[in-house]
């Protein structure tokens, strides 16, 4: 089978290519240039070239910087401007890795696209990985349903520690096996505010309000805050921790309150991404990557919006983040929180 493998120069994508090549597939590597971070690509491309030569496979360098800027980078900036919390990895997977890269794979005549994600596929549904600590099904849940039939995740059945051990036994991979893992947003050097600083003044002090609308302090600029944050602002006379409950970007205000006030039992989604045919779901939902799943009921409307009612309340629900719905270990829907 002819398979395009997304290669980053890291351990996971390298082991993915190695495994598929050893199974006798016709493997082609592809490195994506997504952003202009200084010295980022040169080093990675050298690694990809080294692996490709070792495996004796061809590889391509695909410049997707324009698409990435339009579909991921600028929406990241704009979402923070709106006082919301973006999820750039979910957008990147849908539009870039499982979108533009899949188009490129098809243009080469490839039957499948393989990535180093920790997830599994079964009956055209994404499943959680065997290694729950590394499971990436949450970020893949933004994928177009039609893309799933072309995808392969060879590492989904492996534990991360076994991938590293496997990598350390192969000569060309030995220098990669001890690499620091990349877990942060790829185009953010230190903090997301540094990205926003390139486009606007983020340090415009504003008012801190309590939930009754009373001014109780000052903050350093609304873009420094996300829902649930409890530091970096002043609350006069507070005797208990206060958390950001809401952000008003037009007024440059943040509304704060107690942890109890952060509790939410119901929320709405727009443009729900369904992987099964349904108008109602009785399932579990994750409201952020590392959160535990919570039992819920989902009502889906004609305009693809949805209302979610939680069995138990959650804390710190952030508009702009992705909610992912599971039936046991299978992803059945996703959508961005309003």
From Swiss-Prot:
Gene3D superfamilies: Adenine nucleotide alpha hydrolases-like domains, HUPs, Translation factors
GO molecular-function terms, A-Z: ATP binding; tRNA binding; tRNA-uridine 2-sulfurtransferase activity
Catalytic activity: S-sulfanyl-L-cysteinyl-[protein] + uridine(34) in tRNA + AH2 + ATP = 2-thiouridine(34) in tRNA + L-cysteinyl-[protein] + A + AMP + diphosphate + H(+)
UniProt-listed NCBIfam families: PRK00143.1 (NF001138), trmU (TIGR00420)
HAMAP family: tRNA_thiouridyl_MnmA
Protein name from the UniProt record: tRNA-specific 2-thiouridylase MnmA
Pfam family, one: tRNA_Me_trans_C
UniProt record similarity statement: Belongs to the MnmA/TRMU family.
GO-annotated biological processes: tRNA wobble position uridine thiolation
The protein's enzyme class: transferase
Region (Interaction with tRNA), start-end ranges: 134-136, 288-289
Keyword Disulfide bond found: yes
Gene name of this polypeptide: mnmA
Active site: 92 (nucleophile), 186 (cysteine persulfide intermediate)
Disulfide-linked positions: 92-186
Residues holding ATP: 6-13, 32, 116
EC number: 2.8.1.13
Compartments reported by the entry: Cytoplasm
The organism of origin for this protein: Campylobacter jejuni subsp. jejuni serotype O:6 (strain 81116 / NCTC 11828)
Keywords (A to Z) from UniProt: ATP-binding, Cytoplasm, Disulfide bond, Nucleotide-binding, RNA-binding, Transferase, tRNA processing, tRNA-binding
GO cellular component: cytoplasm
């Amino acid at each position: 089978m002819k398979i395009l493998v997304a290669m980053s120069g890291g351990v996971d994508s390298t082991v993915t290519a190695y495994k598929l090549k050893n199974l006798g597939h016709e493997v082609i590597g592809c490195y994506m240039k997504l952003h202009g971070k200084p010295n980022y690509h040169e080093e990675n491309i050298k690694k990809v070239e080294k692996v490709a030569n070792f495996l004796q496979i061809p590889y391509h360098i695909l410049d997707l910087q324009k698409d990435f800027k339009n579909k991921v980078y600028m929406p990241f900036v704009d979402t923070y401007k709106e006082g919301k919390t973006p999820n750039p990895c979910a957008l990147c997977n849908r539009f870039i890795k499982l979108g533009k890269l899949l188009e490129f794979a098809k243009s080469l005549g490839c039957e499948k696209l393989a990535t180093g994600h920790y997830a599994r596929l079964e009956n055209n549904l994404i499943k959680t990985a065997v290694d729950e600590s590394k499971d990436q099904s949450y970020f893949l849940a933004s994928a177009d349903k039609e893309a799933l039939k072309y995808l392969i995740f060879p590492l989904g059945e492996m534990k991360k520690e076994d991938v590293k051990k496997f990598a350390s036994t192969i000569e060309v991979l030995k220098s990669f096996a001890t690499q620091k893992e990349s877990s942060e947003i790829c185009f953010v050097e230190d903090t997301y505010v540094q990205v926003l600083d390139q486009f606007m003044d983020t340090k415009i002090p504003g008012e801190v309000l309590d939930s009754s609308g009373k001014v109780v302090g000052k903050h350093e600029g609304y873009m420094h805050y996300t829902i649930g944050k409890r530091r970096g602002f002043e609350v006069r006379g507070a005797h208990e921790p206060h958390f950001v409950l809401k952000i008003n970007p037009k007024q440059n205000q943040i509304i704060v309150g107690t942890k109890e006030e952060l509790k939410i039992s119901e929320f709405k989604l727009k443009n729900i991404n369904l992987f099964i045919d349904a108008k109602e779901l009785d399932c579990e939902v994750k409201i952020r990557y590392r959160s535990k799943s919570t039992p819920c009921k989902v009502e889906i409307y004609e305009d693809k919006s949805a209302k979610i009612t939680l069995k138990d309340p959650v804390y710190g629900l952030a508009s702009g983040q992705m909610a992912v719905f599971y039936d046991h270990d299978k992803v059945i829907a996703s959508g961005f929180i309003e």
